[in-house]
Amino acid sequence: HAGNKIATLVSLSANVAGAEEAARNVAMQAAAMNPIALNEAGVDAAVIEKEIEIAKEQLRAEGKPEAMLENISKGKIQRFYKDNTLVNQDYIKDGSMSVAAYIKSVEANLTVSGFKRVALG
């Protein structure tokens, strides 16, 4: 992809009917959307702390009351996970579902167990 400069590998939890196509589709998702982690657990705590601080600073600049900052920043972190973790991203071939929901539609017990994205240049 991208002039043969991006490669992705995807690991699924089982080899069931449709798994090969599903893995190919998820690999395409990872190549196109450049997630930083598989799921919430894979995101470094320092990244989350930084995102929370950025969100709070933006909210303060907008004049939001201090009492509301924590709840609003939690919502912003959920949005961060949705945009930046592979299984929570909107599936590029069907934006009405997440990647996790797409995988479940292939096989109820199927999950994405890992991925690796490499870009040259």
Each PLM stretch: what is its role?
Residues 1-121:
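N-terminal assembly/interaction segments in proteins that build large macromolecular machines
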